[in-house]
Amino acid sequence: MNTFIKTLGVTAFTVGLMAASTVTAYAADYTIRATANSNENDEDYDGLVVFKNFVEAASNGEIAVELFIGTQLCSKGAECLQGVADGSIDVYISTSGGAAGAFPYVQVLDLPYLMASDRVAENVLSGDFTRTMRDMALKDSADKIRLMTIGNTGGWRNFANTKRRVQNPNDMAGLKIRTVVADLPQELVKALGASPTPIPWPELFTSFQTGVVEGSKNGITDIMGMKFPDAGLKYVTLDGHAYMGALWWMNNEKFLSMPIELRQVVVDGFAALQ
């Protein structure tokens, strides 16, 4: 009996060691902290989930991806990009307006009525345009912030408001329209006779309720995903004046710290989320 008990004890100890060594063998060698200033009903969150699942599976667990949604790590584009630069954030998704403070040239994506369709936009963003933008951002951030890819976040921008139907430019007069802190969207709103009002994205719902702003320029999926109709948003003009580019940024040091095969997994992960 004693021999049997001892045998069981040795077996259990051996199994325990094997289990521990298995866990150690599959522990992640790299952790990516990724964030989006949205909620779990937003397509940006969906993109992060696709990225996480792809990267963790394709790397056989060598890379772990932690998701932080909303304002857990940062609340504004400039703050979030600074986090990417200093390494407290590894991956961040922004609109062109959200990144314009650090990289003003990304506002080219907000030029009104520049691209006619999804097909045109996708062809533009899959070629030299994005590679050139990546090189420019690396140079301007002292090689700290890498643009990984440009996808879409919410379709096409449309004007929407809480006050009245907009059928021609004159109907925009006097409306307080939410913008980001960027010259191009603010100048567009001014040109239409409205008043540009910079408001952080997480504060927009409350700003509609309180009347701080009376309109915005967003895609239908953002409007519905953030439940803006519940805050009083009633009128949408489907003018599709700008393609809503999603700029995916990554801390360059974290990216380059990985062996080349894992870098490719990360690159493929960004391709998968588009």
Where do the model's predicted regions map?
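Transmembrane alpha-helix boundary/anchor motif
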Residues: 10, 22, 130-133, 184
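Signature of the catalytic double-stranded beta-helix
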Residues: 123-136
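Sec/Tat signal peptide C-region and signal peptidase I cleavage site
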Residues: 18-27
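Bacterial N-terminal signal peptides that target proteins for export
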Residues: 1-12
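N-terminal secretory/targeting leader peptides
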Residues: 27-121, 138-274
